[in-house]
A protein has these predicted regions:
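Aromatic-rich carbohydrate-recognition surfaces in CAZymes
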Residues: 173-174, 195-198, 270-272, 337, ...
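Active-site-adjacent bridging/hinge elements
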Residues: 146, 244-252, 313-327, 366-376, ...
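Generic, well-ordered alpha-helical scaffold segments in large soluble proteins
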Residues: 314-318, 349-353, 363-370, 426, ...
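Catalytic cores of carbohydrate-active enzymes
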Residues: 309, 428, 435-439, 469-471, ...
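Short conserved catalytic/interaction loops centered on acidic-Pro-aromatic/His motifs
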Residues: 180, 413-414, 492-496
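Conserved oxyanion/phosphate-binding beta-strand-loop segments in alpha/beta enzyme cores
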Residues: 296-333, 362
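Solvent-exposed loop and edge beta-strand segments that line ligand/cofactor-binding
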Residues: 154, 261-267, 326-344, 380-393, ...
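Terminal accessory carbohydrate-recognition/targeting modules of carbohydrate-active enzymes
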Residues: 2-303, 307, 334, 341, ...
Length: 526
């Protein structure tokens, strides 16, 4: 069974990642479907909620915004939403503005709702998953529904450099007059919180042009603009959808039910072959440009035709550029921001090995600025966590080592090696707040487990579950590697004798400290 890592498909398929039931992996379709589309799911899989609700997709942009839900459009996490954006003036977490968009097909007065929602009492309503015939991802997510004689296609694009989602509906086939109704469900909340019906929410809806509306439930949030490009009318029929249930949160032990508000719906007639575009963003747009913008975004996507292309696309999802001179690798979607250690671990794969060396320079330059400020005890930007963690500088050296092994003559070589020397000197001078250098050359981590001092940072009542301290195996393995790499890069004749002496002591000390009688390595030694 083939699998694809859950790193957005940025997460970067442009990235779309398939997340498994444990948030790790998801099976790919049977081999007989790969010639048609590498990532394709049929009615059998999608109509079975036990299966389809385990399959999620994430799409992000360069600004840290994303959309994320299950393949059938049913939100199962409090983090799920169609337009999730950073609003740093409110809180450091992302915020969900548009939770979902429920489509309804109307023929001969009969309504067929294509949405799917779970409720706290176990109810599933509507049951739109029963109408899905196919879901595939080539350059973008595409869902095909069949309702009687109606065949409707839904495609979505999350814009690359804007906080904007565009959803295209195309009537592929119909034997009679067809009406399409689009009902948005809005949240206006932090991704880690849940909302409930209240009297504080401002449920006013304002018209935008002739085919759009804007709304903002709470003070401090930006207006959410929702527009369509077709001749349509907006129906002010707002109400709270109560007791929506997120089973993934229940499994995680968190509150799992909330109320969300739907302000009304758009309604329009569709003819065979006709398309309508729905867009949601933070400002008014010219709806006549939506078809061209949609096509342009699709043209810049790379098709997911095999595992490698999926992973390359996924890597791009994590590239985060909040400002022109600040470049990062996000630690993960949907809940993590920028974490220094994770960034340095992931940087080689997200740049060097995905054929984007320029990304390495951009991210490493930002990281080096932050690291030097940390060494100088200058206040650090709030958008990067964990710069003081004990092995962050060593992972950065490892990333530089891998980069220079691929690009040995790069113009940045001298700049990077100067930084490597500066980090090594920082550790040797005992200025790191957690680590100290021992006479045997090993690094020793101080700490009581409050807070945790390593990447194993789970806590109960403020205490580390695994209170690692002392000689840490990965820290000292990276430390030995850093020194040896620096000696090789500088050349033995230019290598300081002091560092050569540390290497001579460190090698034997590592073996004596960490290798146990059975040939395994101790995790840490106090």
């Amino acid at each position: 069974e083939r699998v694809i890592l859950s790193t957005t498909c940025h997460v970067t398929t442009e990235p779309l990642a398939l997340v498994g039931s444990r948030g790790v992996v998801a099976p790919l379709p049977p081999s007989n479907l790969l010639s048609m589309s590498y990532l394709k799911f049929d009615r059998t899989t999608l109509s079975n909620l036990d299966r389809s609700l385990q399959l999620e997709h994430i799409r992000s942009n360069r600004g840290g915004a994303f959309n994320c839900t299950t393949l059938v459009g049913c939100n199962t996490r409090k983090y799920h939403g169609l337009l999730v954006v950073p609003l740093p003036h409110l809180r450091r977490h992302n915020h969900i503005l548009l939770s979902s968009l429920d489509a309804t097909v109307i023929q001969h007065g009969a309504e067929f709702n294509l949405g799917v929602h779970l409720y706290g009492d176990g109810t599933v309503y509507p049951n739109g998953h029963k109408y899905i015939r196919e879901y595939n991802i080539d350059k973008m997510p595409r869902t095909i529904y069949r309702v009687g004689g109606v065949v409707l296609q839904r495609e979505s694009i999350f814009c690359h450099y804007k906080n904007q989602v565009i959803i295209k509906f195309t009537l592929l086939d119909s034997h009679s007059e067809t009406t399409l109704r689009l009902r948005p469900v809005v949240a206006f909340r932090d991704v880690i919180l849940l909302s409930h019906e209240n009297d504080t929410a401002d449920t006013t809806v304002h018209p935008v042009g002739t085919t759009g509306v804007r709304t903002c439930l709470y003070e401090g949030y930006p207006d959410l603009y929702m527009q369509v490009d077709a001749s349509s009318h907006w129906v002010d029929e707002g109400y709270w959808i109560k007791n929506l249930h997120y089973p993934k949160e229940q499994i995680r032990g968190y509150e799992s039910c909330e109320d969300l508000y739907s302000p009304g719906y758009f309604e329009m007639d569709l003819r065979n072959g006709e398309s309508v575009y729905f867009t949601a963003q933070l400002e008014e747009v010219d709806v006549t440009t939506l078809p061209a913008l949609f096509d342009s975004e699709v043209a810049h996507r790379k098709a997911r035709v095999d595992l490698r292309s999926c992973l390359r696309n996924a890597c791009s999802q994590f590239y985060y550029k909040p400002e022109s001179n600040r470049h990062y690798i996000l630690a993960g979607f949907p809940w993590y921001g920028v974490r220094a250690r994770d960034e340095m671990v992931a940087l080689p794969g997200c740049s060097i090995y995905s054929d984007h060396p320029e990304r390495f320079h951009n991210v490493m330059s930002t990281f080096i600025r932050s690291s030097i400020n940390f060494i100088k005890q200058i206040e650090l930007p709030l958008d990067m966590e964990g710069v003081r963690d004990p092995d962050v500088g060593l992972w950065a050296i490892r990333a530089i080592q891998l980069f220079l092994s691929e690009y040995p003559d790069d113009s940045h070589r001298s700049f990077y090696l100067d930084f490597v020397g500066r980090i090594i000197d920082y550790y040797l001078s005992d200025r790191h707040p957690i680590l100290r250098i021992e006479p045997n050359g090993l690094l020793y981590a101080e700490g009581s487990g409050t807070p945790p001092v390593t990447w194993m940072d789970s806590t109960i009542a403020g205490q580390a579950v695994v209170p690692r301290r002392g000689y840490l195996v990965e820290v000292n393995g990276l430390w030995y590697n850093a020194l040896c790499f620096y000696r090789e890069a500088r050349g033995a004749e230019n290598f300081p004798e002091e560092l050569a002496s540390v290497i001579e002591r460190l090698g034997p000390a590592f073996e004596q400290t960490f290798v146990n009688p059975y040939g395994y390595l101790y995790d840490y030694v106090t």
